[in-house]
Amino acid sequence: MSKQLVSIIDVPKHIGEEITIGAWVANKSGKGKIAFLQLRDGTAFFQGVAFKPNFIEKFGEEEGLEKFDTIKHLSQETSIYVTGMVKEDERSKFGYELDITDIEVIGESQGYPITPKEHGTDFLMDNRHLWLRSRKQMAIQQIRNAIIYATYDFFDKNGFIKFDSPILSSNAAEDSTELFETDYFGTPAFLSQSGQLYLEAGAMALGRVFDFGPVFRAEKSKTRRHLTEFWMMDAEYSFLSHDESLDLQEAYVKALIQGAIDRAPQALEILERDVDLLKKYIAEPFKRVSYDEAIDLLQAHEKDEDTDYEHLEHGDDFGSPHETWISNYFGVPTFVVNYPASFKAFYMKPVPGNPERVLCADLLAPEGYGEIIGGSMREDDYDALVAKMEELGMDRSEYEFYLDLRKYGSVPHGGFGIGIERMVTFVAGTKHIREAIPFPRMLHRIKP
């Protein structure tokens, strides 16, 4: 059998031709003289059909019956080389199918644990290394790949340079209570929560920079939106205003959605994602509302029949129900800007004339997906930043390099970060973030 293989995703290019593919058997059915194989090769799924009379005619009765019997008894996830003629077939959900003419078993698969029946989440997570082979999980990872590709493409086109921040650090970028600590040759070190502080150094050297890599948060959270290890894209830029930053963030998110539509259309179809709704998010401008305006809206509607959130006063932080209501109220991704300084990071620049608010923004995704981007303008004044650190009782010695950026040619600058898994969950329309990463790390899960 020829081993010049064709990928399933390229099969439509070979209508009327005999081809060979390498694939796994996702499922099979049939009876009597016909057998149907559901095949996958990592690029897509499609169907092959084997007719017993055709095998007898081609190979003779003894060998033909033997090959057809092999097909009928293939077990789930057996790997095979399969040869056949590609034929258009309107009855097939793929629009075409493979008329199988030969088969060769590569690797047997006996007792595959994930069968077509329903399984519980814990069982599927324990077998995550195998669950990834399912149609839905493959589709989610294809969307993840499309979003990562679109990230690199967007920043390259917008003049950004990839800048690699360290994963081990001696300081915290955000909340020090959420750090994973390790020993670094006798000195305490921490797994990175964010590359932001180092990216600011990159922005002072290169103007526009971004990084992309794993970050770690020791959050004891069991929600559907939290992981302890996830992949973060952080971007930093010099000489950009707050409004220009929001414009950039909006363009970036729209590019990610478009990237998934362009590069993973079959995956979106498998997941039954409403692509017209995604296109609406691209076509319409994102809403921008201040934190205080959002609080006023929440208070005005808190007694409506369809609301389900707790009362908030000005100065309170949002919970997930509040974020969901805000984004659903506007129906498109919504920037909430200028939060209280009291619960935001030390490095955020105050709103001119209103030191109780900072120049920041969270982008809230509709459909209940909540925050997907957090960003701010950074405090670029040395004395103001030192005063803020002293107010919070921070150890300046851990941040000398960061303060130096304000001593030697400081400029207005800002940045934002996006957790790729949250974006994947939103674009894919899935319910839980654990499916947006190949091997999720959560409060009570570090295997497989």
From Swiss-Prot:
A Pfam family matched in the record: tRNA_anti-codon
One GO cellular component, as annotated: cytoplasm
Catalysis performed (reactions): tRNA(Asn) + L-asparagine + ATP = L-asparaginyl-tRNA(Asn) + AMP + diphosphate + H(+)
Cross-referenced InterPro entries: Aa-tRNA-synt_II (IPR004364), aa-tRNA-synth_II (IPR006195), aa-tRNA-synth_II/BPL/LPL (IPR045864), Asn-tRNA-ligase (IPR004522), Asp/Asn-tRNA-synth_IIb (IPR002312), NA-bd_OB-fold (IPR012340), NA-bd_OB_tRNA (IPR004365)
Single GO molecular function: catalytic activity, acting on a protein
Major localisation: cytoplasm
Subcellular location: Cytoplasm
Similarity comment text for this entry: Belongs to the class-II aminoacyl-tRNA synthetase family.
NCBIfam families, alphabetized: asnS, PRK03932.1
Xref: PANTHER family: ASPARAGINE--TRNA LIGASE, MITOCHONDRIAL-RELATED, ASPARTYL/LYSYL-TRNA SYNTHETASE
Subunit details: Homodimer.
Entry protein name: Asparagine--tRNA ligase
Originating organism: Streptococcus thermophilus (strain ATCC BAA-491 / LMD-9)
